[in-house]
């Protein structure tokens, strides 16, 4: 059989592309996925205790894009959910992102207005110009003490690099607040798929024009498969057989525990910002899904360089390697590289969906 498109990867990028091409343009699609499941890192499943958990760590859907929200709403109902995170610093819990409550509790202040907190930040900040790295972007806003307490050690554990070795985009993802808003995100649309991400992907890919091949490296079938075009969402360095060197990624090793408790944590996730703990984060999944159960399942996250590719490591050295691969990819006709791994970019889920929706529209004109 001949396919219109061979799509490598069944995560957000590959699945949205497949659905749009099949349903809107009547294209015949073969998706090839190296794992034994669809949904990429958003994959969720019920553990042995009946708790719906995210196999690759917490994935919280949030977006300001009405187009993205309405598109995904075709495949799922939603549960309203606003994510909250507490930082564990020396056994005490503080809201993250840093806000007025964090500052008041940490420094025994009693600020009641945004201006007071803004003035406080102004009094402790150390001007950095130009902003060259992740240390600069935080110290420039809130000074050394808050940087060292909440950002330095956590970032070093997460990336095994000092913040001054990482692009400003890493720590720049986290806002600094002057109000008491303790939600992790402030996007207009904040929900969780009612029946989980995997069910949403199953509905998305349930189309007679879409065929899925799991447990398969695309390189093992590409010479025997007839297709007109390819959409590649895997690691770009692997596509080119690492000819310019391997692009580094951070991965995560998870340790799982199930405990006899209806609720364990005061927020869905705790970030451990000190040096004492090797893990960076604990997450209690029931708080996201709204499940009612006599037990609760939590994951502990230990960043590592071994395992599945989770996070591209954004710094100048890696960017130079990626640009060589990107230049090479642009020479290829009928192959589209899209997604976090193939663009070596730290996209959120909604950003990937939005990018693919625009890309498929553009390429089908």
Name each region found by the language model.
Residues 3-31, 360:
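N-terminal Rossmann-like FAD-binding beta1-loop-alpha1 element of flavoenzymes
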Residues 12-13, 36-38, 101, 156, ...:
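Short, solvent-exposed loop/turn segments at secondary-structure junctions
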Residues 312-365:
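C-terminal catalytic lobe of FAD-dependent flavoproteins
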Residues 90-229, 233, 238-240:
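Active-site/ligand-binding neighborhood in enzyme catalytic cores
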Residues 49-123:
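Dinucleotide-binding Rossmann-like beta1-alpha1 core, especially the glycine-rich loop
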Residues 24, 216-328:
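Mid-domain catalytic core of redox enzymes
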Residues 70-71, 137, 146, 265, ...:
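Structural/interface elements that position substrates and couple domains in central-metabolism enzymes
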Residues 22-48:
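Glycine-rich FAD pyrophosphate-binding loop
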């Amino acid at each position: 059989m001949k396919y219109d498109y061979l799509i490598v990867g069944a995560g957000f990028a590959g699945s949205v592309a497949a659905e749009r091409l099949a349903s809107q343009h009547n294209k015949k699609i073969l998706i090839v996925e190296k794992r034994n499941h669809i949904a990429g890192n958003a994959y969720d499943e019920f553990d042995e205790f009946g708790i719906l958990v995210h196999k690759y760590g917490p994935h919280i859907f949030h977006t300001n894009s009405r187009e993205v929200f309405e598109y995904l709403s075709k495949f799922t109902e939603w549960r309203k959910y606003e994510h909250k995170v507490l930082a564990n610093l020396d056994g005490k819990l503080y809201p993250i992102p840093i806000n007025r409550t964090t500052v008041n509790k940490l420094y025994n202040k009693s600020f009641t207005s945004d201006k007071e907190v803004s003035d406080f930040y102004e009094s402790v900040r150390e001007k950095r110009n130009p902003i060259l790295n992740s240390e600069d972007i935080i110290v420039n806003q809130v000074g050394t003490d808050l940087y060292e307490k909440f950002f330095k050690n956590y970032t070093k554990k997460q990336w095994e690099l000092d913040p001054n070795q990482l692009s400003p985009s890493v720590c720049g993802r986290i806002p600094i607040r002057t109000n008491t808003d303790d939600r992790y995100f402030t996007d207009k649309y904040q929900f969780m798929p009612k029946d989980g991400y995997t069910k949403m992907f199953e509905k998305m890919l349930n189309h007679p024009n879409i065929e899925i091949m799991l447990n398969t490296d695309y390189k093992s079938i590409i010479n025997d498969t007839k297709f007109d075009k390819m959409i590649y969402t895997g690691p770009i360095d692997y596509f080119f057989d690492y000819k310019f060197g391997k692009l580094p990624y951070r991965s995560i090793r998870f340790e799982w525990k199930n405990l006899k408790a209806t609720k364990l944590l005061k927020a869905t996730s705790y970030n451990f910002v000190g040096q004492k703990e090797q893990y960076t984060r604990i997450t209690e999944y029931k708080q996201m899904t709204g499940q009612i159960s006599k037990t609760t399942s939590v994951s502990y996250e230990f960043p590592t360089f071994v395992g599945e590719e989770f996070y591209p490591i954004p710094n100048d050295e890696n960017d130079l390697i990626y640009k060589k691969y990107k230049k090479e990819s642009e020479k290829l006709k009928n192959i589209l590289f899209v997604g976090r791994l193939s663009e070596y970019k730290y996209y959120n889920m909604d950003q990937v969906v939005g990018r693919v929706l625009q890309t498929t529209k553009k390429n089908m004109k």
